[in-house]
Amino acid sequence: MFTINVEVRKDQGKGASRRLRIANKFPAIVYGGEEAPVSIELDHDSVKNMESKPEFYSEAVTLVIDGKETKVKVQAVQRHPFKPKLAHIDFRRV
């Protein structure tokens, strides 16, 4: 099982997302269930290492958001067109 420490995003929009990517992070969203959607930011290198394993897509992933654990599954992944970079991930609560 995979566990990822994440931070809640404070800024939204294209400029904020670009600043995240320059800082070797990328935006993501957690949605589904009874709770409201949450915009988060993840460290690119740690997620890229996990993402290379097939279990990342088939098993539940644990996100630690502000000290609270949330079980999610990967719903969608957006990648950079030609660089080996992740651009955005959608997580669905389980």
Swiss-Prot record:
Gene3D superfamilies membership: Ribosomal Protein L25, Chain P
Keyword Ribonucleoprotein: yes
Example GO BP: translation
CC terms in the record's Gene Ontology section: cytosolic large ribosomal subunit
Alphabetical keyword list: Ribonucleoprotein, Ribosomal protein, RNA-binding, rRNA-binding
InterPro entries tied to this protein: Rbsml_bL25/Gln-tRNA_synth_N (IPR020056), Ribosomal_bL25/Gln-tRNA_synth (IPR011035), Ribosomal_bL25_short (IPR020055), Ribosomal_L25_dom (IPR029751), Ribosomal_uL5_bac-type (IPR020930)
Gene Ontology MF, one: structural constituent of ribosome
Quaternary data: Part of the 50S ribosomal subunit; part of the 5S rRNA/L5/L18/L25 subcomplex. Contacts the 5S rRNA. Binds to the 5S rRNA independently of L5 and L18.
Protein family per UniProt: Belongs to the bacterial ribosomal protein bL25 family.
Function per UniProt: This is one of the proteins that binds to the 5S RNA in the ribosome where it forms part of the central protuberance.
Protein name as catalogued: Large ribosomal subunit protein bL25
GN (gene name): rplY
